[in-house]
Amino acid sequence: MNLFKSKLMNRIAIAKIVGLVFGLLAFIMVPIIFINADIYLRFAILLWYTSIGAFIGVMGIINKHPFLNFSFPFWIRGPFLGGWMNFVLVLFIYDKISFLMQNTAFSGLSPFWLITEGMIVGFVIDLIATKVVGDGKKLIKD
């Protein structure tokens, strides 16, 4: 699939599209799961997952850790980045998520479970972007 001349831009576009799909799913499902969720939270999550897709797309050029010198394949890179980004999200909106989780089946669980969700989403985004476009230095050698 060639949307752009650059392989890196193609990877970023594919990853953003997959992130947008996850964001749209969350946009639809959040009010079903969390009755008190407002429209601002829904749009924030939509844009958040699109941003995670862009971030994972850009980071696809790194398939070897620059400092620790070990392989950084998609099945490590995607979950790490998705989990890290959702960790940051939980730090920003911990109180809001805790409040929303009180009256649901998730009552009593920690909002930090969103990190696991981010790892799964990150894995899927990076898997699809890597299978469709590739990763590593070949992305910048056009």
What do the predicted segments below correspond to?
Residues M1-D142:
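Juxtamembrane/disordered regions of integral membrane proteins
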